[in-house]
A protein has these predicted regions:
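Coil-to-beta-strand transition motifs
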Residues: 42-44, 52-59, 152-155, 169-174, ...
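Hydrophobic side chains in beta-strands
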Residues: 49, 65, 160-162, 179-181
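A generic structural signal for short coil/turn motifs at secondary-structure boundaries
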Residues: 10-12, 129-130, 188
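Active-site nucleotide/adenylate-binding loops and adjacent lid/helix of ATP-dependent enzymes
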Residues: 1-98, 136-140
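Conserved active-site beta-strand-loop modules that form the wall/rim of enzyme catalytic pockets
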Residues: 46, 56-59, 103-107, 112-115, ...
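A long amphipathic alpha-helix within ATP-dependent nucleotide-binding catalytic cores
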Residues: 81-170, 216-234
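C-terminal active-site "lid" helix and adjoining low-complexity regulatory extension at the edge
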Residues: 163-235
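Generic detector of well-ordered alpha-helical segments enriched in charged/polar residues
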Residues: 23, 27, 80, 140, ...
Length: 235
């Protein structure tokens, strides 16, 4: 997997299959990028975590399951037909054709599920399901153990790949593919079952947490961003 070193919303994230594709990505990139192992676990969650600088233990404030964009075959239609049937997948047609150009005219067998975009980003067609109620003490302890080892990390979302939800809840058999900092969102709010009012409430709650962390860091001697630095960070 190739991705921008500093990215947003899954933009620029591509699965590379050979050296030619990597060279093409390099030639068309005007930014620093990372080459990352492709994790073959089937599932992904986003785990939102925070810890106040003067406290030893942090907290998980939300967990979201990411359902990758996919289609199911009926034994009659081509992959392209199936993609175009669903507005969510049709919106991603250009990206799908780039990655699966040799498969678009294949008839997909009945009930076979094809993952179109193997990235858990809302802007890449993934559906977000709030599973915050699945957070266990064992999982919270393991995430806390990991995050406290990252110097200066007090707030953000960990994107995690896993195979089995029960093992994940036990704090086992998962891999972290990204750690997102203060620009990250509590993406469990994007579950279609939640209202806009729930989303506003979650955003407000997390901004208050981030502001409190900022004040505590300032008290410890870390300077606030000036106006120029603040606007630059927003770009």
């Amino acid at each position: 997997i190739v991705k921008p070193n500093i990215g947003l919303k899954g933009l620029g994230v591509v699965e590379i299959k050979n050296a030619d594709e990597l060279e093409n990505y390099y030639k068309n990139s005007d930014y620093d990028f990372l080459i990352q192992e492709k994790i073959n676990f089937k599932n992904e969650v986003g785990i939102f975590y925070h810890r106040f600088p003067d406290e030893k233990k942090g907290k998980i404030t939300g967990m979201v399951k990411k359902e990758f964009l996919s289609v199911k075959g009926d034994g009659k239609k081509t992959l392209k037909d199936l993609v175009m049937e669903n507005p969510r997948s049709a919106y991603q047609i250009k990206a799908v054709e780039q990655q699966m150009r040799n498969e678009m005219q294949k008839i997909i067998p009945e009930n076979e599920v094809i993952i179109l975009v193997p990235f858990g980003s809302h802007t890449r067609g993934a559906k977000f399901i709030d599973i915050s109620t699945e957070v266990t003490e064992k999982l919270a302890q393991k995430i806390d153990e990991i995050c406290t080892k990252v110097n200066g990390f007090y707030y953000g979302r960990l994107d995690v790949m896993y195979e089995n939800i029960e093992l994940l809840k036990n704090g086992e058999n998962f891999k972290i593919i990204e750690i997102n900092g203060s620009k990250s969102e509590p993406t469990h709010m994007y579950d279609p079952k939640h209202s806009i009012f729930f989303a506003w409430k979650e955003i407000t709650k997390h901004w208050k947490i981030m502001a409190k962390i900022s004040r505590k860091n300032h008290q410890a001697g870390f300077p606030y961003l000036n106006i120029k630095e603040g606007f630059s960070a927003l770009k």
